[in-house]
Amino acid sequence: MTSASPEDQNAPVGCPKGARRRRPISVIGGVSLYGTNQTEELDNLLTQPASRPPMPAHQVPPYKAVSARFRPFTFSQSTPIGLDRVGRRRQMRASNVSSDGGTEPSALVDDNGSEEDFSYEDLCQASPRYLQPGGEQLAINELISDGNVVCAEALWDHVTMDDQELGFKAGDVIQVLEASNKDWWWGRSEDKEAWFPASFVRLRVNQEELSENSSSTPSEEQDEEASQSRHRHCENKQQMRTNVIREIMDTERVYIKHLRDICEGYIRQCRKHTGMFTVAQLATIFGNIEDIYKFQRKFLKDLEKQYNKEEPHLSEIGSCFLQNQEGFAIYSEYCNNHPGACLELANLMKQGKYRHFFEACRLLQQMIDIAIDGFLLTPVQKICKYPLQLAELLKYTTQEHGDYSNIKAAYEAMKNVACLINERKRKLESIDKIARWQVSIVGWEGLDILDRSSELIHSGELTKITKQGKSQQRTFFLFDHQLVSCKKDLLRRDMLYYKGRLDMDEMELVDLGDGRDKDCNLSVKNAFKLVSRTTDEVYLFCAKKQEDKARWLQACADERRRVQEDKEMGMEISENQKKLAMLNAQKAGHGKSKGYNRCPVAPPHQGLHPIHQRHITMPTSVPQQQVFGLAEPKRKSSLFWHTFNRLTPFRK
């Protein structure tokens, strides 16, 4: 019997014999630069579901999925400095003869036969299995095949109108039932099973314990099997806390490695090629990621000081988060900038020289096999993971533990930071939809809607009563700070004409009971009014049903509350982001069809709904939203129709 080789002894836990992991693994997934036989093992574990709808074909929202690796190209003059030195180190696979006569891959060696040095060897060896390439999917399916309940926590909201997709909110617990695809997993939440984007969730470290928050209700037989499995694999509370502490430390070290690769591998090379990148372009693409790298290095040092290597469950790391909670505010700027960075990168990637350049940067830095947009997404994901990690750590920290109070305070602090950033991201995504909506409105007058507003709160039809007692049926859109009034086209009910707006900052909402209103001297039903604080002018509105009126009253109250919250949190959208959203919407509106006599026809209006303010996946199978209107008031016949019949080119 042959003894284990040094390479086998140094192999990380969870890896096949001899398959030594050379590089750390990203928290955003991906594949290793070096070969692995885990793919075959994963395929053997996967079971085909009995009957499930097809997997969604669109890209994962709100950010596109991590791009596939660019194929090698012939490098041009834009090749980063130093790439020629990569070829001097000939990377070879040294083969070890196993006991069964086969060959197994071992460590990489250079030309002189010595092993390459790398700073994260200990990290790779000590990392949990889910940090290994393909290890997360493999670990999930192993647990599922063994009858365990696998739970994941949502990082972001996922709102969808597709029945084939699972909707949830940040912090919700999802039971994972299948993870055969790296982008889409099959899971259960609130008694519903459907597909959901894998990048939206964080796999729980301690999967042995069935989540108390899980809304799934397994049968008695499944419950008995899960109970036996928990008794078989469950560890004590100290071990559970150890698992969470190790996850925080391991992922933090890997995260620092990715930030270093971005700063040294991409930014440094870009600055050397002034002919390809301007200072403004680099600021747009990378934002303040160098400041984040500097901050995270200090934060990791603080964590290392508090980390008890011998007994990790005794580590007291809560104070590290509390001492640095103000520093985490720099993530807000980065997350605000990230959508613009994606647009700038997408424009550059249309040119081959930029694709070659960024791939060459990755190879020169010996980074893992993920495109640049995947690396730039890591800070956005990281700041959303902290509250989930701290929540799980708090769960396994007893009140008698010396770190309990600090962990509890740190959890609340990081949750507030993540909520603020999530809200900013949601608003940034909504302004594009609002800009496209404005472009679709015919005859828009005055300032752009984005000059004052960034969120649609409610919309619907109301009857406006004028001073003369006339009723006007209008479609109203309530944004933060303003209420926009539109009129439907007589022929095309999906086309809207701009009719005016009210400044909600100057209005006072008054609920009216059914009966005669003294201001207008009219009998009204399901009515409310807005009174100007400066001019005392009264605007009277009537809803079709009492339920509609109640929704409008609640929406007006929500509008005032959100405006106040945005003011307290300093929630502002930059002028550049607003201008960019309007510019993109106007470009998208060009080239539309023209009506009779070369009169431009506005694009069909698609009513915005408050649900659209979050991450929306709109499948093609969902029909266009129907608009149910109130009855049009009768009008006298007009000469217009007689003239129209003579001019129209269409004949029966």
Curated annotation (Swiss-Prot):
What SUPFAM superfamilies does the record tag this protein with? DBL homology domain (DH-domain) (SSF48065), PH domain-like (SSF50729), SH3-domain (SSF50044)
- On whether Phosphoprotein is a keyword of this UniProt record, the answer is yes
Q: List the top taxonomic levels of the source.
A: Eukaryota, Metazoa, Chordata, Craniata, Vertebrata
Which residue intervals define the domain DH in the entry? 240-424
What is the species of this protein?
Homo sapiens
An example GO CC term for this entry is: podosome
- Which stretches does the entry tag as region ABR (APC-binding region) domain? 98-150
The question of whether S-adenosyl-L-methionine is a record keyword is answered with no
Q: In which tissues is it expressed?
A: Expressed at high levels in the placenta, spleen and kidney, at moderate levels in lung, small intestine, liver, brain and heart, and at low levels in skeletal muscle. Expression is aberrantly enhanced in most colorectal tumors.
Quaternary context: Interacts (via ABR and SH3 domain) with APC. The binding of APC enhances its GEF activity by relieving it from an autoinhibitory conformation, in which the ABR and SH3 domains are associated with the C-terminal tail. Interacts (via C-terminal tail) with PPP1R9B (via C-terminus). Interacts with RAC1.
**Single GO MF descriptor:** guanyl-nucleotide exchange factor activity
Query: Pfam families, from UniProt?
Result: RhoGEF, SH3_1, SOS1_NGEF_PH
Under the heading CDD domains, the entry gives: PH_Collybistin_ASEF (cd01224), RhoGEF (cd00160), SH3_ASEF (cd11973)
- Compartment(s): Cytoplasm; Cell projection, Filopodium; Cell projection, Lamellipodium; Cell projection, Ruffle membrane
Q: What is known of its domains?
A: The C-terminal tail is required for its GEF activity.
**Protein's name in the database:** Spermatogenesis-associated protein 13
Which keywords label this protein?
Cell junction, Cell membrane, Cell projection, Cytoplasm, Guanine-nucleotide releasing factor, Membrane, Phosphoprotein, SH3 domain
Q: What gene name is given for the protein in this entry? A: SPATA13
Using the record's annotation, list all stretches that form the SH3 domain: 147-206
Region (C-terminal tail), start-end ranges: 561-652
